[in-house]
């Protein structure tokens, strides 16, 4: 009888230990965020990732005035867990976040707020389309925070350089939110 009980209880204890060691989903206070990029109430963090990659800019003629400017073309980044594992990718256009599990979403920028000098702005994105079952399923907002680098090149952009592309490195935290 003791052997049968031990064989039944041991796996239950192991499962209980595993369950109690799982960390709860992180919570991120919106209090320190600029109002423009705060996620609306009624949402919880579903996932977080660190985007590490490049942003491409192209020297183009200005649309509404004379001269040229560096124009954002798109990102190409790996999405990493806090432990350094690649969990997905971020690319565009259109802005697309794709999980290694095959789920992905596209989004539209709602707002930006200034970040530090030399850093791309903080950003709030609303999900437009989502496909696949997995990590991206049910995500309604994406917040870009803790940005480093990624701003347009400082080198001159003129008619002689029109069509030239420059790639700059960047890093940012992406916080994925779901409705409660």
Locate each region found by the language model.
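Non-globular disordered terminal and juxtamembrane segments underlying protein topogenesis/assembly
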Residues: 21-22
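Bacterial N-terminal signal peptides that target proteins for export
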Residues: 1-8
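Primary mode marks residue(s) on the alpha4-beta5-alpha5 output face of response regulator receiver
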Residues: 25-56, 63-180
